[in-house]
UniProtKB/Swiss-Prot annotation:
Function according to Swiss-Prot or TrEMBL: Required for maturation of urease via the functional incorporation of the urease nickel metallocenter.
Major subcellular site: cytoplasm
Gene3D superfamilies: Urease accessory protein UreF
Entry's family note: Belongs to the UreF family.
Name of the coding gene: ureF
Subunit structure: UreD, UreF and UreG form a complex that acts as a GTP-hydrolysis-dependent molecular chaperone, activating the urease apoprotein by helping to assemble the nickel containing metallocenter of UreC. The UreE protein probably delivers the nickel.
Native source species: Burkholderia multivorans (strain ATCC 17616 / 249)
Chaperone is among the record's keywords: yes
Name of the molecule in the record: Urease accessory protein UreF
Length: 226
């Protein structure tokens, strides 16, 4: 990996990326309301479970296959798989989340003219567009390798979940850093598992997350949009 490619992935994983990630907790706030999270240890366990039991089986392998589709510019496969991922979201909040963040990242890619004209046209045709599809596009535009792309995506997810826990539990900054450090090896394992997952084995089944997300829609007091 070149330094330029590394910097591009750091950019995509940055919390400063203007796609609204800070406004979503992906069920963490509902888990807190259900008393599944109540301190630093339970927050770490929740985030670790989401990484190894949900992301590693669904979003990460999906991202890897979308990256390959963008590299080959297989527009029909991109459209079909993107539509499948959007349909796989188990609540209206989770669907709006991936659509809003995907749209924001796609608009950023277009504004910065990342990728060639033909691929940008395909990107614009994907409506609605899921976040992993847009992330894969941005990564492909910078010629980044799949393992590094998945690691950047997973780290960004862990960091955002930790930031949500800091606000909602609440936790101190040091507790948050301990969570991130504790999950380094889990990120590596999740990436390796995702890279070994064939396209027909991608699995987004997460009933507890779906139920909590649906409950969050009517939760009395909320900081986050999911």
């Amino acid at each position: 990996m070149t330094t330029t490619e590394l910097v591009a992935l750091l950019h995509l994983a940055s919390p400063a990326l203007p796609i609204g990630a800070f406004s979503y907790s992906q069920g963490l706030e509902a888990a807190l309301d259900a008393n599944l999270i109540h301190d630093a240890d339970s927050a770490r366990n929740w985030i670790a479970s989401g990484l190894t039991d949900v992301l590693a089986h669904g979003e990460l392998p999906f991202l890897a296959h979308q990256l390959a589709r963008w590299q080959a510019h297989d527009a029909p496969a991109l459209a079909a798989e993107n539509a499948w991922f959007v349909a796989s979201r188990e609540s209206s909040e989770l669907r709006r989340e991936t659509e809003q963040m995907g749209w924001s990242l796609a608009q950023l890619c277009a504004s910065l003219e990342w990728g060639d004209a033909a691929r940008r046209a395909t990107l614009a045709s994907l409506q609605p567009i899921a976040l992993p599809t847009a992330f894969a596009y941005a990564a492909a535009a910078h010629d980044a390798g799949a393992d590094a792309v998945l690691a950047a995506y997973a780290f960004g997810w862990v960091e955002n979940q930790t930031a949500a826990a800091l606000k909602a539990v609440p936790l101190g900054q040091l507790a948050g850093q301990r969570i991130i450090v504790a999950l380094r090896d889990a990120i590596d394992a999740a990436v390796r598992r995702a890279l070994a997952t064939p396209a027909d084995a991608v699995n987004t089944f997460a009933p507890q997350l779906g139920i909590l997300s649906a409950r969050h829609e009517t939760q009395y007091s909320r900081l986050f949009r999911s």
